[in-house]
């Protein structure tokens, strides 16, 4: 039976090490991204398994499934602009995240309606914004709220 009197060792819990670890991980990610070659898009990427049409809308189920992103983003934005999150220092990051969720629904819906490399950009671009704003939220919630707030825009710009 383990001794519950002693705290479990956690390297990121040691006072003063969180920020250096975060900077090291970030530096490794940036260096890796700069050194690796671009990933080519396979030619068959746009061939969906389910290509059924309904009401004249091609790939109907792929297109309409994006309504969930629009709905979730709308509910999230209502919470940000309502009383749920409005007083939080990270509310701009939450606003960008939920706004990006709406844009994911729109961009991905357009891509699945007309799948090609040009519309794929509008599928992926809002995802990059959402991922980076989510990273700022995680940094703010678990490391330091002010750092997360200040990193929002640099992270979003880095992501796009």
Task: State each model region's role.
Residues 3-160:
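Multi-pass alpha-helical transmembrane bundles in non-GPCR membrane proteins
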């Amino acid at each position: 039976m383990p001794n519950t009197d002693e705290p479990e060792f956690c390297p990121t819990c040691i006072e003063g090490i969180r920020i250096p670890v975060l900077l090291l991980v970030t530096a490794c990610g940036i260096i890796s991204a700069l050194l690796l070659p671009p990933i080519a898009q396979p030619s068959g990427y746009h061939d969906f398994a389910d290509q059924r049409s309904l009401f004249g809308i091609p790939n109907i189920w792929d297109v309409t499934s994006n309504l969930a992103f629009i709905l979730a983003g709308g509910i999230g934005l209502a919470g940000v602009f309502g009383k749920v999150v409005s007083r939080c220092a990270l509310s701009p990051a939450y606003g960008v995240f939920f706004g990006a969720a709406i844009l994911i629904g729109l961009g991905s819906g357009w891509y699945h309606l007309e799948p090609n490399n040009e519309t794929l950009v509008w599928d992926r671009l809002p995802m990059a914004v959402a991922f980076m704003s989510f990273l700022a939220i995680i940094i703010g919630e678990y490391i330091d709220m002010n750092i997360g707030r200040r990193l929002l825009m640099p992270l979003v710009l880095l992501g796009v």
